[in-house]
Amino acid sequence: FLRF
């Protein structure tokens, strides 16, 4: 995802 965006951070993961």
From Swiss-Prot:
Residue numbers of Phenylalanine amide PTMs: 4
GO cellular component, one term: extracellular region
Compartments, as annotated in UniProt: Secreted
Keyword line: Amidation, Neuropeptide, Secreted
Chief location: secreted
Swiss-Prot/TrEMBL GO biological process terms: neuropeptide signaling pathway
Family listed: Belongs to the FARP (FMRFamide related peptide) family.
The protein, known as: FLRFamide
